[in-house]
Amino acid sequence: MKDKGYLIQRTTLLMKHKIEIVIPKVENIEIELDDSNSPNTVKKFVENLPFTVGMNLWGEEIYTDESPIKEKEENAKPLVELNDVAYWPSGKAICLFYGPTPIGKKDEIKPYSPVNVIGKILKPEKSVLEKISDGLEATFQLKK
């Protein structure tokens, strides 16, 4: 009797969450979180919804004041891609990258220090994101 070879494939379910960032007097931002890179960070993010934080700018990055999320580095990346959404463990902040940062070289988006990538910006266009100014308050909530 011959042994039959079987390929056993494990599948993991990718969890996605649509989040709305409500900013009074500015168009809302829609992001989509997925747990493929930093599942623990995404889980803590969703568990803490809704929350309201101040917003700040650094180059073409929007980052929040300290959020209620407390997570260590989880597959943290020193470089990110255009429209990445990340959690910055050092500052307990949420970061939205829509272009270059002051310390990135040409055509690279470099966070201040490594970040846990947790999703992507879906809407709006960059021209709307550029209208956000330091100090605006934003509420992160599940999209209805």
Predicted regions and their residues:
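Start-of-domain signal
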Residues: D3-N48, T52
